[in-house]
Design a protein with these regions (language model features):
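Positively charged n-region of N-terminal signal peptides that target proteins for export
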Residues: 1-4
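Cap/insert and terminal regions of metallo-dependent hydrolase folds
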Residues: 25, 94-106, 206, 211-281
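Short, conserved loop/helix-junction motifs that constitute active-site signature segments
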Residues: 136-138
Length: 281
């Protein structure tokens, strides 16, 4: 009897091992992962003058893992493919601009998850500093705006696009949205929000965290805080008027919900935040 009980417990452990941490969560958890840095860029690209910005024009590029009791979602997947990163701490620089020292997948695995455990993939937009490892998640359900899908795979050429990083998604399982929001797990705690302008189908991620409170990850709606305070739009946005309209709606949404907004690329913002294995819940 004792040996049967031990065998049963062993089987249960093997079956639930990958999902044990997920099942134990009472609300969503947000893990911030290190997906590199971007060398200083000319602030005029963002509608700003050098003397108008506080920093040197450099950026950070985080990735995010959301763990919900009903599943997992990866938000943005880096700027340098894991295959190009040695993984020994050596810095890799792509296009003399995008830097990375750490692979994405080992960071996920360190939290107890494998690529096959990621139920949903969502990226803010198709720019190459957000899509580098997208093909690794071709087995996940991809949440994308129709306009973004068309920009990614259509005949029209778009700047800052590297289709080789996401070409396996073309025929993958997906939830395609038509300029619409999407409640990922059906309880209002993890919501994809449409936010066009920077790209045709740019989107953001809204979270209702039990302890931290409501939070908005804004993709590239802003890159620098000064874009927000001085009302400047990057010169390379797909549609500046659309960006401005999205910003107005977003500011109203923040006021209505009381949500914090993290500017994903902003180094000072990122420096203050807890990184995986710590999390926000």
């Amino acid at each position: 009897m004792k040996s049967r009980l031990l065998s049963a417990l062993l089987v249960l452990t093997l079956v639930t091992g990958a999902t044990g941490a997920l099942a134990a969560t009472k609300g969503p958890r947000l893990y911030i992962l290190d997906c590199g840095d971007i060398r200083p860029m000319d602030p005029t690209l963002f509608g700003l003058k050098k003397e108008e910005i506080a920093g040197d024009g450099s950026f950070v590029t985080p990735c995010y893992l959301v763990v919900h009791r009903k599943g997992t979602l990866i938000w943005d997947v880096g700027q340098v493919p894991d295959a190009q990163i040695p993984g020994d701490g050596t810095e890799v620089v792509v296009q003399d601009l995008l830097k990375a020292r750490r692979k994405l997948v080992p960071q996920i695995e360190a939290l107890g998850y494998h690529v096959s455990d990621i139920d949903f993939l969502a990226m803010s937009h198709y720019h190459l500093d957000h899509t580098a490892n997208a093909n690794l998640f071709a087995g996940s359900t991809w949440i994308v705006q129709q306009a973004e899908y068309d920009a990614m795979f259509g005949a029209r050429e778009f700047a800052i696009r590297d289709s080789s990083s996401y070409d396996k998604l073309k025929d993958s399982k997906r939830i395609t949205l038509k300029d619409a929001d999407h409640d990922v797990f059906g309880d209002g705690t993890v919501v994809i929000k449409t936010a066009p302008g920077h790209t045709p189908g740019h989107q953001m991620l809204f979270l209702r965290l039990k302890n931290f409170g409501p939070l908005l990850l804004e993709g590239d709606l802003y890159h620098l805080p000064e874009e927000r305070t001085l009302d400047r739009v990057p010169t390379f946005d797909f549609d500046a008027a659309m960006t401005r309209a999205t910003r107005v709606k977003t500011e109203a949404f923040l006021k209505k919900t009381g949500a914090q907004m993290w500017i994903q690329h902003d180094p000072p913002t990122n420096a203050q935040l807890k990184k995986a294995p710590d999390y926000y819940d």
